[in-house]
Amino acid sequence: MEKISVIVPVYKIKEQYLKECIESISKQTYSNLEIILVDDGSPDNCGEICDLYAEKDSRIMVLHQKNQGVSMARNNAIQKATGEWITFIDADDWIEKNMCELAMEKRDENDMVVWNMYLNKDANQQIKKNYEKDLSVDDEKLLEKINLNFLRTISLSKDEIRIPTLEGPVCHLYKRSIIKENNIRFDSSLKQGEDKLFNYEYHKYIKRFTYINKPLYHYRLHGESTTHTFFAGNADTSTRILKKYYELEPRINTSETYRNTYCVRVGVIAYFLIGKYFLHPDNPNRKNAFREFKILMNEEPYKSAIAAIDLRVMDLNLNKIKLWLLKYRKYRSVFLYYNLVNMIQKIRGVK
């Protein structure tokens, strides 16, 4: 019976959330688990709570470290892991009791198993929009198409297979041998985007994976979520991430398909930065947002990559409109477009 190493980084988590998370793991119907809780120097009583659970369950290992961030917490746990498989869970989330069992049922001949999630906010719960069928991928061309979609972050057409849960570290069952043999780690120098880079590198070494079209993970949405907060280094970090993708994927220089895919990603990130950085309500320099955005668009990789985007391969949709405006440097129109879309989403109650 193969073992799963369940890795949970812990830092400043509400006691109720942390307990719910740990108990949802310890009560799994698949029992051969190694539960690694990493107390990342949390200043509250999170470390003590983890220790109490370890006293009750011999499968629980607690690593106490000075605060080094979520990436180092995961990396240190990977070093300690002994299971044939690894899965990651965020300490403020929880999982369905049969998550590990269903994932292990699909592990045979696979290098990775992926599944869907619930999005939970207070008493509301909805299933994350994802690919709507079970899927087993062992065809090299289809695997490449899915990886290109991952690199691009958006679909070129409505017929493409897109699985958003491929991007983050949760909702995954990874083969530890692939991680170990290829020395795949989370980049601790990055404050965001390190999880997607980890997955993209991992995907380079897989031959087959299975997607389970069933929500088995509960992702908690709340005010403290990092996705909703302003990060002063967002523009710089995003630029560094784009450069790391360039380094990770040599085919960007040898394949027109990969080159255009990368260029599209640069454009998508540029648009993302309008809302997450330049026009974010907590940006203290928001009054200079337009001028600073223009300066960034004249820097690399943005300037060359966005100019080189081939829009002909895309269906006409909202993404194509954004990229067209960026490609032809209609920056004032891009800002107006963003504000219009944002206003409509607020009216509709879309986050």
Describe each region flagged by the PLM.
Residues 70, 91-209, 217-233:
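Donor-binding/catalytic cores of nucleotide-activated saccharide
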Residues 86:
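Short aromatic/hydrophobic "clamp" motif used to bind/position activated sugar donors
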Residues 2-5, 24, 34, 197:
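Cell-envelope/extracellular polymer assembly enzymes that use nucleotide-activated donors
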Residues 65-81:
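Glycine-rich, basic loop-to-helix element that forms the pyrophosphate-binding segment
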Residues 13-27:
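Short, well-formed alpha-helical segments that are part of the catalytic scaffolds
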Residues 279-351:
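Membrane-interface aromatic/basic loop that binds lipid-linked glycans or pyrophosphate carriers
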Residues 214-222, 228-256, 268-302:
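Catalytic core of nucleotide-sugar-dependent glycosyltransferases
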Residues 31, 39-48, 90:
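A conserved acidic beta->alpha catalytic loop
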